[in-house]
Curated annotation (Swiss-Prot):
<keyword id="KW-0805">Transcription regulation</keyword>
<feature type="region of interest" description="Sigma-70 factor domain-4">
    <location>
        <begin position="204"/>
        <end position="255"/>
    </location>
</feature>
<dbReference type="InterPro" id="IPR039425">
    <property type="entry name" value="RNA_pol_sigma-70-like"/>
</dbReference>
<dbReference type="GO" id="GO:0016987">
    <property type="term" value="F:sigma factor activity"/>
</dbReference>
<dbReference type="InterPro" id="IPR013249">
    <property type="entry name" value="RNA_pol_sigma70_r4_t2"/>
</dbReference>
<comment type="function">
    <text>Sigma factors are initiation factors that promote the attachment of RNA polymerase to specific initiation sites and are then released. Extracytoplasmic function (ECF) sigma factors are usually held in an inactive form by an anti-sigma factor until released. ECF sigma factor involved in aerial mycelium formation, required for translation from the bldMp1 promoter. Expressed as a preprotein; processing and accumulation of the mature protein starts as aerial mycelium formation and sporulation commence.</text>
</comment>
<feature type="region of interest" description="Sigma-70 factor domain-2">
    <location>
        <begin position="105"/>
        <end position="172"/>
    </location>
</feature>
<dbReference type="InterPro" id="IPR014298">
    <property type="entry name" value="BldN-like"/>
</dbReference>
<comment type="similarity">
    <text>Belongs to the sigma-70 factor family. ECF subfamily.</text>
</comment>
<dbReference type="InterPro" id="IPR036388">
    <property type="entry name" value="WH-like_DNA-bd_sf"/>
</dbReference>
<feature type="region of interest" description="Not required for transcription in vitro">
    <location>
        <begin position="1"/>
        <end position="87"/>
    </location>
</feature>
<dbReference type="InterPro" id="IPR007627">
    <property type="entry name" value="RNA_pol_sigma70_r2"/>
</dbReference>
<dbReference type="Pfam" id="PF04542">
    <property type="entry name" value="Sigma70_r2"/>
</dbReference>
<keyword id="KW-0731">Sigma factor</keyword>
<dbReference type="Pfam" id="PF08281">
    <property type="entry name" value="Sigma70_r4_2"/>
</dbReference>
<dbReference type="GO" id="GO:0003677">
    <property type="term" value="F:DNA binding"/>
</dbReference>
<keyword id="KW-0804">Transcription</keyword>
Length: 264
């Protein structure tokens, strides 16, 4: 019913490169320049740990200041690219009761939701059940979804996240990522040696991710493996964007300490 879950090679490659940069920094001078961003004085250094944080705090302030005037004028849906506009059209049709439109939304987002749940629970059967329940709840609640800059996929992941939390509360099941099943490389042909080395490197990285605390683990999963933006991750996790950047920063630093040098 659901596709085989493979590693998002680009996401893992980016995470591995970010962790490698953090390891290099940890081997040299570090402490003061890399204080916790929320507490750092003056400008936050745009170091590698912020590679996926969508710009430094300065950039964020510039964007906010430039958009502050426009934000006060209207509350209409912002101009979006063609894909976003198409998705929102499907959402609106589904809200009007079109079953075909909801079916197309399912086709578009089921893989994303399934991957998120699978990375969290580590079992195919459980992931399939929770994915089905996610879309059942989404169908019941689709009338409550409003755009306001929020991606529909992030809304679905929020529902999935709550179901995963309920799953862990209602059982003794522990998060256990089945690394062997996730290491499915089927994009391009590589030499056997390269494939083995990449698999070993991915396995070590995923093992290190499993050893993060739950919030750091979820942040890394959403940001690197699911490819969500800082804003989307913040909405899914119920935090502000600054908290997500700090969480990501600490997670990457922890991974840099956990990951063996030969697994980079």
């Amino acid at each position: 019913m659901y596709p085989h879950v493979g590693v998002d090679a680009s996401g893992l490659a980016t995470l591995r490169a970010t962790v490698k940069s953090a390891q290099d920094l940890l081997r040299g001078f570090v402490p003061t320049a890399y204080a916790v961003p929320a507490l750092a004085a003056a400008a936050v250094p745009a170091g590698p740990c912020y590679a996926l944080a969508e710009g430094s705090a300065v950039v964020g302030r510039r964007a906010r200041s430039s958009s502050s005037g426009a934000a006060a004028t209207t509350h209409r849906r912002p101009a979006a690219d063609s894909d976003s506009a198409r998705m929102m059209e499907l959402v609106e049709r589904a809200q009007a009761g079109e079953a075909d439109a909801f079916g197309r939304l399912y086709d578009q987002y089921s893989d994303t939701v399934y991957r998120y749940i699978y990375y969290r629970v580590g079992g195919k059967a459980t992931a399939e059940d929770l994915t089905s329940e996610t879309f059942l709840r989404a169908l019941r609640r689709i009338g409550t979804f409003t755009y306001q800059g929020r991606d529909f996929g992030a809304w679905l992941v929020t529902i999935a996240r709550n179901l995963v939390a309920d799953h862990f509360k209602s059982s003794r099941f522990r998060l256990e990522v089945t690394t062997g099943e996730m290491l499915d490389a089927n994009e391009v042909e590589r030499s056997p040696e390269d494939s083995v080395l990449e698999s070993l490197s991915n396995a070590a990285l995923l093992d290190a991710v499993r050893r993060l605390n739950p919030q750091q683990q979820e942040c890394v999963t959403l940001r690197f493996l699911q490819g969500l933006s800082v804003a989307e991750t913040a909405r899914v996790m119920g935090k502000n964007e600054g908290a997500i950047k700090t969480l990501q920063y600490r997670a990457v630093r922890t991974l840099a300490r956990l990951l063996p040098d030969d697994a980079r």
